[in-house]
Each structure stands twice: as structure tokens, then as C-alpha cells.
């Protein structure tokens, strides 16, 4: 979402730079808002309606006491963007029967097959038993792709490599996996023509009676997402939408807005290529991140999940901050995924102020430090004072680094140890237990 954040980040900086808001300033900011929305590929009619609504509120509403007009303008922008992208009501995905059958639809190139595996992985994490069914008889690689992904995430798979009848494959697949909690059925994304594709998915829909029909749309299509959604809606009900590739384009904003306009509910967004990179789409959190307000809730939840698992919080609270605890912290940070994704959640536009080079260097340092710590004995990890020059040389050799690298890491550790009281307070404030 970096591209989208950059577009709106410039707008937010401009708003924060004004000292007061008169008619001329408001008109100028209105044009900037329109430019940002158009760059995000939001449909023109929605851009106009959005701007009119925001300007009307700024003119008619009085900011609460103590709130500067520019801050209130940001608040209005935030609220109107949330409305534009679907409103405050967070989406839900709760299987209500067994098996709960999910039918995935989408055109070729939307990332549908990968999304099937991502959704399965997310549901497995929530404790559901999930199976995957491949019905694509047009694209030969689809069978192997989904089977391999199913093996990677450890879920049952059904498909027929040489099958010709997608409808029968779907029916047999659901029957074979009927003892699971959720069965996700992947369908073809291309056919002889659009009509044939839509007729096939309609026939599969009638054969397996899915509990939820999910349309997968590529974010790069921008405002054209509405046309895709409406084309499928003419043939069968669309219960929810997943927008993929949100990490690679600013046009994702337009795709989200266009889908919301059709009345369909965006439930998930794909934010990377890995099977773990599918997120529940919550408009207010999404908008906060795009505007540079951050999504500390999401960041804290992810950190808490990892650090609680490793019992790092308890160890720091007890005042125990040896190299063993330091190693657990590094392992925990690396479990969060790429640091670029973690930094995107920071507030106040901090992510934009951290260069790609700095993030990459931080990622490399974490991996280097983990290698260094892994080369130490348990005794050394628990008692860092044992680390003399001879031991440091041995550790450096085992980790494939220089003794200087080891000493630099130990300096970072000592600094962190001195900051442990502050860190302890932060953990208590941000991660209530």
C-alpha cells in the first residue's frame, strides 16, 4: 500500500502546513483532494460527490473546542474516506454450517488461485479445518499450483488433473471434503469467451450451493473493478470481495471505492505474495494507515501475539534482559514478516521518513544478529559477561561474521538493557494482559 500512502501522504502534509482555512485555502485543498483521489483511480463521479460532501462539512460544522481547523479537516477527510470505502461496519467471516462452502470467482490474472490458499491459511490459523478444490480445466497449471499450495499450508486438496467437466469436479470435491469445516472451491479465470466463463461458474454455483460466493479482483484494474463485479452479479449473487495486489499499486483505492459503490462488501485485501499476506479489510484502519495516522492497533496485536508466545513480556517485566531474551525478541520481530510491512503501520507519516535502504539494512542486521546469537552457548546467552575476546572470535567464526559485528550487536544489546525500564512501561501501556 506504499504507493497509495504516498499519494495521500502528500495531501496530509499540505493540510497540516496551512495556518488557517479561508475560502481560497479550502478551494485549493479541495482540488488537492480531487487530484489524490483521481491518482488512486477513484471514479470521477465519486470524486466529485466525495469532495462536495467534505467541503460542505468543513463549511457548516464547527470544530470542537481546542481542535485546530486543519486537524478537523483531516478528521473530516478520514471520516469521508471511511464512508467511501464501505463504512464503519467491519466485515465478518464466520462459517455457520459444516461444511461451509466458499466459491471463488474472478478473471484470469486476478490472483484467485493463490488467494484460495491464502484464505485457507487464514482460516486454519483461526482453528478451522479447511480443504481446497480446483475446478479449472482450462489452465493446466492451476491443478499443480493449488495442489502445491495446499501441501505448503497443510490442508486437504481435491482436483482431477485430466478432468474435463468443471461442474462434476466441483461436486465430487465438495463431497470428498464434506467432513471439514470449510471447503474453498477455485474456478477458472479464463474461457473461450466471457459468456462461457460466466455460464460455467453459474453451473458450479447451482451444483454445490455455496454458502458464500467471493469475487477476487486485481487492485491494478482500479475503477474498472465495478464493471467486473457487476458482470458477475448479473449471473449469481456476490456475497463478498477480495482485492489482491494492494501492495503494488495506488489504484487499489479506486478498486475499493468502485466495489463499495456496487454494494458488494470487501472482506479481505491481499498485501503481498506470501500465503500469510491476506488481511481482513477494515475501512477505518485502512484509511488511518493510508493517511499516515498509522494502525498501531494492528501492529500491537501482531507484536503481542508473537511476544506473548515467546514469553518475552514476562521476562522483561521481571527485569530479566539477558541475551537469551534479546534473541527471542529478534526471533519475534523476524516472525512479523518484512519490516517494510511493519513500518507501514507506524503513525504520523513515520514510514515515509524511513528509507528503503534503512529498512533493508535493519532487516539484514536482525538476520545477522540472530546468526550471532545462534552461535553462542546457552551459558553465554544467559551470562553475557562471559564474552571475552576469545569467545567473540569463536562466535564470529561460527556465524560467518567479523568480531566487530559481534561487538556492534553487544553494544545494541547494552543500550536496550539500559532502556528496559522504558520498554517495560511501553509494554504495559500498549499490551494489556
Swiss-Prot record:
Positions contributing to GTP binding: 106-113, 186-190, 244-247
Catalytic activity annotation: GTP + H2O = GDP + phosphate + H(+)
Primary localization: cytoplasm
Catalytic activity, EC: 3.6.5.4
Keywords associated with the record: Cytoplasm, GTP-binding, Hydrolase, Nucleotide-binding, Ribonucleoprotein, RNA-binding, Signal recognition particle
An individual GO BP term: SRP-dependent cotranslational protein targeting to membrane
Compartments where located: Cytoplasm
Keyword set includes Transmembrane: no
Entry superkingdom: Archaea
Coiled coil: none
Pfam (any one): SRP_SPB
Subunit structure: Part of the signal recognition particle protein translocation system, which is composed of SRP and FtsY. Archaeal SRP consists of a 7S RNA molecule of 300 nucleotides and two protein subunits: SRP54 and SRP19.
Function (record text): Involved in targeting and insertion of nascent membrane proteins into the cytoplasmic membrane. Binds to the hydrophobic signal sequence of the ribosome-nascent chain (RNC) as it emerges from the ribosomes. The SRP-RNC complex is then targeted to the cytoplasmic membrane where it interacts with the SRP receptor FtsY.
Entry's free-text remark on domains: Composed of three domains: the N-terminal N domain, which is responsible for interactions with the ribosome, the central G domain, which binds GTP, and the C-terminal M domain, which binds the RNA and the signal sequence of the RNC.
Protein's name in the database: Signal recognition particle 54 kDa protein
Gene: srp54
Amino acid at each position: 500500500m506504499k504507493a497509495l500512502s504516498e499519494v495521500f501522504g502528500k495531501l496530509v502534509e499540505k493540510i497540516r502546513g496551512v495556518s488557517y482555512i479561508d475560502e481560497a485555502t479550502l478551494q485549493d485543498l479541495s482540488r488537492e483532494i480531487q487530484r489524490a483521489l483521481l491518482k488512486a483511480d477513484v471514479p470521477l463521479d465519486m470524486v466529485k460527490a466525495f469532495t462536495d460532501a467534505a467541503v460542505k462539512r468543513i463549511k457548516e460544522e464547527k470544530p470542537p473546542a481546542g481542535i485546530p481547523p486543519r486537524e478537523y479537516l483531516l478528521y473530516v477527510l478520514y471520516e469521508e474516506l471511511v464512508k467511501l470505502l464501505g463504512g464503519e461496519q467491519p466485515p465478518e467471516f464466520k462459517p455457520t454450517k459444516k461444511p461451509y462452502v466458499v466459491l471463488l470467482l474472478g478473471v484470469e490474472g486476478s490472483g484467485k488461485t493463490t488467494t484460495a490458499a491464502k484464505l485457507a491459511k487464514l482460516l486454519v490459523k483461526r482453528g478451522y479445518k479447511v480443504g481446497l478444490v480446483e475446478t479449472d480445466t482450462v489452465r493446466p497449471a492451476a491443478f499443480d499450483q493449488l495442489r502445491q499450495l495446499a501441501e505448503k499450508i497443510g490442508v486437504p486438496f481435491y482436483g482431477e488433473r485430466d478432468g474435463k467437466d468443471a461442474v462434476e469436479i466441483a461436486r465430487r470435491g465438495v463431497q470428498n471434503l464434506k467432513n471439514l469445516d470449510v471447503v474453498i472451491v477455485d474456478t477458472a479465470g479464463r474461457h473461450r469467451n466471457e459468456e462461457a466463463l460466466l455460464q460455467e461458474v453459474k453451473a458450479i454455483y447451482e451444483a454445490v450451493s455455496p454458502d458464500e460466493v467471493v469475487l477476487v479482483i486485481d487492485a491494478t484494474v482500479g475503477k474498472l473493478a465495478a464493471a467486473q463485479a457487476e458482470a458477475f452479479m448479473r449471473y449469481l449473487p456476490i456475497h463478498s470481495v477480495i482485492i489482491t495486489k494492494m501492495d503494488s499499486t495506488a489504484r487499489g483505492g479506486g478498486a475499493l471505492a468502485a466495489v463499495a459503490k456496487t454494494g458488494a462488501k470487501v472482506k479481505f485485501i491481499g498485501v503481498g505474495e506470501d500465503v500469510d499476506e491476506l488481511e481482513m479489510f477494515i475501512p477505518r484502519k485502512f484509511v488511518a494507515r493510508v493517511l499516515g495516522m498509522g494502525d498501531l492497533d494492528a501492529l500491537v496485536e501482531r507484536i503481542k501475539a508473537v511476544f506473548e508466545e515467546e514469553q518475552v513480556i514476562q521476562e522483561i517485566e521481571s527485569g530479566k534482559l539477558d541475551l537469551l531474551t534479546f534473541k527471542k525478541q529478534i526471533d519475534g520481530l523476524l516472525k512479523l514478516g518484512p519490516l517494510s510491512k511493519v513500518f507501514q503501520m507506524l503513525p504520523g507519516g513515520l514510514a515515509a521518513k524511513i528509507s528503503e535502504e534503512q529498512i533493508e539494512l535493519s532487516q539484514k542486521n536482525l538476520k545477522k544478529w540472530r546468526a550471532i546469537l545462534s552461535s553462542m552457548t546457552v551459558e553465554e546467552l544467559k551470562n553475557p559477561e562471559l564474552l571475552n575476546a576469545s569467545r567473540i572470535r569463536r562466535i564470529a567464526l561460527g556465524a560467518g561474521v567479523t568480531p566487530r559485528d559481534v561487538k556492534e550487536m553487544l553494544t545494541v544489546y547494552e543500550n536496550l538493557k539500559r532502556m528496559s525500564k522504558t520498554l517495560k512501561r511501553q509494554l504495559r501501556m500498549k499490551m494489556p494482559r
